[in-house]
Amino acid sequence: MKKNPLFPQIKGIMHGGDYNPEQWLDRPDILEEDIRLMKQAGMTSATLGVFSWAVYEPREGEFHFDWLKDIMDRLYENGIYTILATPSGARPAWLDEKYPEALRVDSYGVRAHHGVRHNHCMSSPVYREKVRTVTDKLVSHVGNHPGLLMWHISNEFGGECYCPLCVNRFREYLADKFDHDISKLNHAWWTTFWSHTYNDFSQIEPPYQNGEYSIMGLNLEWKRFTTYNMTDYMKSEISFLREKTPSIPITTNFMTLYGGLDYHVMAKELDVISWDSYAPFHNDYESLWDTFAANAFSHAHMRSMKKGTPFMLMESAPGLVNWQPYNKLRRPGIHALESLQAVACGSDTVQYFQWRKGRGSFEQYHGAVVDHLGTNDTRIFKEVAALGRDLLKLTGVSGTIVPSKIAILYDWDIRWAVEDMKGLASSTKRYVETCVGFYKEFLKMGVDPDIISCDHDLQEYDVIVAPMLYLVKDGLGERLARFVKGGGQLLATYLTGYVNADTLCFLGGFPGDGLSEVFGIVSEEIDTLYPSDTNVVLFEDGRKGTVRDYAEVLRVGTASVLGSYTSDYYAEGAAVTVNRYGDGSAYYIAARLDMDALRPLFLEILKKAGIPTLDLPEGVEYHCRAGEGETYHFYLNTSDHVQTVSGVHGKNLLDNETVDGVLKLEKYKAAIVQVL
């Protein structure tokens, strides 16, 4: 595996964050102090211009960029590179006053007023024109600056717009998709139900809250269109920058598992994947390990969208945030641990929002490296500076990747369809939580799965895990069959193969699209359990597992039964099966079982695939990065006491000590062991 460092001009892992000097232009002393403190903290980059439009262009056609060039000059002179954002994430008041069509319309048909952010219409020609104008001026002033490292498109894309422009684009999108044949759309959406048949594409409206939202196909296509329209807007910014500065890479910052956009679609247009990580550490509903593991799922998801290339941790909070229900401070050591987790999972950067806390407005209490106190002797500043010194030791890690031969399917189409389906129990569907739960169980065994969409190349892997594969896209059934027939190990669960890409139920039995043959079973019924209901599955080896929420009743064909229900009318019926198919095996878990009961099954699957596991102490997380013959093992202790890990050999890059057999990990500490 060849190393592919994102920024070879930077030593170690890049260290930086959002910097907002436009808030301090009246305080040159603070701007000067910022440079001094950045160097002390080991900063090698700064993200500028995310919300600077009103300073760039305070009145229409009046531009001011000298201050920006001055800041970039000073940063570069002090060894700090610039990631420069296009300013489209928030608009100046003059734009909304003169061009109200740039404001979004909500799902009740009400147009927004000026304010907050992310409420611009992506279809608006005038908005696109004004963004291009200010970006053109920006490029002409600093596009050739030697310190310019990367373009950061807008900020945290999200939301949707129901204005007439977007409605018309939606109709055009549907007409193109269904070959301008309204009868095809009517069939795909099953509109004869409730007499909702359309005569023309002009009759179709998006799913307004006070309108039509009862058609599953409509709701899903609106979600897909929102991604299409957002991506089209993003591409308008990207294409302009690629024309003007072709050598500068481009990213935009994603938001963990945000439900409003299909990041797999957007990722195809970007050079590098980046995201903003704000895990709710120290909450009262899960262990610290669980919080870290859920965060690792998001990291794995981000890295998997650009296989073979590191991703970027674009934002994180060294102290706390100000928008969660409870904004608890990270305890000493946690910030460094979560930052090194990002590196362990494949990031080549550690970056923050924000460098310095502002004096007012919405994020004045959001965590920052420099607090309102403004000094370098706070706990958080000292922790950030110590981390900066550690990141300098990881030059060899930069550009390596996380090798994985196992993948979990996580797909926005499935998520949207499951969340919108009218059935089961709305409060216990938990598609995202189920995917994360499977990831956590493998992570406990020292196995770090990739997180991929259903469109990804399955042949890269030896094991595919497909939780709640409710919607089967065109061709996926055939691809999964080919994967198993060729020797792959496939694991699926209840609610697999119920509907096609239009949300129409398959006929002839679930799972559809040929998957019943692959798994050797047919699901005849699915039982939804009340929160107080349980069942029990008895496995062949005598162990038992508790069933909650959902239990399918199976008709077994060619599959072998590994576990059976013990109560209710489906007692002794199959609950867990395996089917030999070609050179591989297809496992089916028909009920929502506790993960402890499934662990032996997972170990069996991994053993068949030749994927090694580790016996890790509870609370210790493991990851691996490799490239060009070098291998780095990451061990993270999320527990509040000392842990030891056996079988570790190499050099710990953080303390330069040789490890020969037993690794000792202090509370909330990490070790990065290079194999010698």
Regions found by a protein language model. Give the residues of each.
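Aromatic-lined substrate-binding rim segments of carbohydrate-active enzymes
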Residues: 32-40, 47-110, 139, 237-244, ...
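N-terminal carbohydrate-binding accessory modules
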Residues: 1-45, 58, 73, 397
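Short, well-ordered coil/turn segments that N-cap beta-strands
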Residues: 11-15, 42-44, 76-82, 144-149, ...
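Carbohydrate-binding surfaces of carbohydrate-active enzymes
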Residues: 201-204, 235, 247, 267, ...
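Conserved, mostly hydrophobic/aromatic
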Residues: 17, 38, 46, 75, ...
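Short, acidic/polar
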Residues: 24-40, 132-137, 255-265, 331-339
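Polysaccharide-binding and catalytic clefts of secreted carbohydrate-active enzymes
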Residues: 109-297
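The substrate-binding groove and active-site-proximal loops of carbohydrate-active enzymes
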Residues: 15-25, 51-66, 113-132, 154-161, ...
